[in-house]
């Protein structure tokens, strides 16, 4: 039987105003300074050790506060060397903001205080991607999975693909993985001079890579990547300039331009919206006391309404970019 219809509601983290972490008291700051002074010989303070001695503060809060201290020290050092800024006070005021700064400021105004909720949602997306069967099959060596389908084979170390294992594609996953076990055998004599540790360095676990990106997006403790996994992450970053021109840039530019003009256009003032509180305050004596509770309920409802709810957009996609504009543009067939 068909289940009864269920009304989908927004997550609880999107409903209310997300409050930031509690401010640091003077006692906590003095205690943190003493802990940092005791670790002057260390190149980088460990937030885990500091959280054990500094009660009431988590690793994430300590890590964020340390980043704020580093940024403050860097700004003070720049101000001492360049009192008027890197290009002087007048030049700095006249310099227009960079495009990324304009979009970042606009996104912050739209999402409001939901930055932490957006970081959590983005981290959850990467966590789900880490458990995808295709992700497990792309790892080297491939991880066992119950997903049915033809696993995608990785290229050999010499850059040549092995066409032989592709023939028994209709066979189940277990027999197809069995012939791959003797493949690393001929590589051992060539790697014996480098030592057994190189085998672990060349292992690529995409599940660990996704977990690493998920933890980094939330400034959390990330797993340690191998040399090959670090090379994969570096290659992803270096390939961004090559991948951006492959997007449908013309349609993407048109959409972003229309979105910017729509979001920055002056909004018309509603007829009764702005005069509602003032009219209620002026005519409080003429109105009956029975009409005041609905007005207070509306005021409370408007106060609980987030900026993204008032704008009618999803905070995970504040600029309403269609998904087809985020993929590679279709190349014309030759």
From Swiss-Prot:
- Per UniProt, what is one Pfam family of this protein? SNAPC2
Assign the protein's first listed, main location to one coarse class.
nucleus
Tell me where the signal peptide lies: none
Q: Which GO terms describe its molecular function?
A: RNA polymerase II general transcription initiation factor activity
What superkingdom does the record give?
A: Eukaryota
Location of region: Disordered? 137-200, 271-306
Could you tell me where the Low complexity compositional bias lies?
167-180
The subcellular localization recorded is: Nucleus
Cellular component terms per the entry's GO annotation: cytosol; nuclear body; nucleoplasm; nucleus
| Xref: InterPro entries | SNAPC2 (IPR021281)
Q: What keyword terms does UniProt attach to this protein?
A: Nucleus, Transcription, Transcription regulation
Offer one example of a GO biological process linked to this entry.
snRNA transcription
User: What quaternary arrangement does the UniProt entry report?
Assistant: Part of the SNAPc complex composed of 5 subunits: SNAPC1, SNAPC2, SNAPC3, SNAPC4 and SNAPC5. SNAPC2 interacts with TBP and SNAPC4.
Function, in words? Part of the SNAPc complex required for the transcription of both RNA polymerase II and III small-nuclear RNA genes. Binds to the proximal sequence element (PSE), a non-TATA-box basal promoter element common to these 2 types of genes. Recruits TBP and BRF2 to the U6 snRNA TATA box.
Q: What is this protein called?
A: snRNA-activating protein complex subunit 2
Please name the source species: Homo sapiens
Please name the taxonomic classification of the source. Answer: Eukaryota, Metazoa, Chordata, Craniata, Vertebrata
Corresponding gene? SNAPC2
């Amino acid at each position: 039987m068909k289940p009864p219809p269920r009304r989908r509601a927004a997550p609880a983290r999107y409903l209310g105003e997300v409050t930031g972490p509690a401010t640091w008291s003077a006692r906590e700051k003095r205690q943190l300074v003493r802990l940092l002074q005791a670790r002057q010989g260390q190149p980088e303070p460990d937030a885990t050790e500091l959280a054990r001695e500094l009660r009431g503060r988590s690793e994430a809060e300590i890590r964020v506060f340390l980043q704020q201290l580093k940024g403050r020290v860097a700004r003070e050092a720049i101000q001492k060397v360049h009192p008027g800024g890197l290009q002087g006070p007048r030049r700095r005021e006249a310099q227009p903001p960079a495009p990324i700064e304009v979009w970042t400021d606009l996104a912050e105004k739209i999402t409001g205080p939901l930055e932490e909720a957006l970081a959590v949602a983005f981290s959850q997306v990467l966590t789900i991607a880490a458990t995808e069967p295709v992700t497990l099959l792309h790892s080297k060596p491939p991880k066992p999975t119950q997903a049915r389908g033809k696993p995608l084979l990785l290229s050999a170390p010499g850059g040549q693909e092995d066409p032989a294992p592709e023939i028994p594609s209709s066979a189940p996953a277990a027999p197809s993985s069995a012939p791959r076990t003797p493949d690393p055998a001929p590589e051992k004599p060539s790697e014996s001079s480098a030592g057994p540790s190189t085998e672990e360095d060349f292992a690529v676990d995409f599940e660990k890579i996704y977990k690493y990106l998920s933890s980094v997006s939330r400034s959390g403790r990330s797993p340690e990547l191998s040399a090959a996994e670090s090379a994969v992450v570096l290659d992803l970053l270096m390939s961004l300039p090559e991948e951006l021109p492959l997007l449908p840039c013309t349609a993407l530019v048109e959409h972003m331009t229309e979105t910017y003009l729509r979001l920055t256009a002056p909004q018309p003032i509603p007829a009764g919206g702005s005069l509602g509180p003032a009219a209620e305050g002026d005519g409080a004596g003429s109105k009956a006391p029975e009409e005041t509770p609905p007005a207070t309920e509306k005021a409370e409802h408007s106060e609980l309404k987030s900026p993204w709810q008032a704008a009618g957009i999803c905070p995970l996609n504040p600029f309403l970019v269609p998904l087809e504009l985020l993929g590679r543009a279709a190349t014309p067939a030759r």
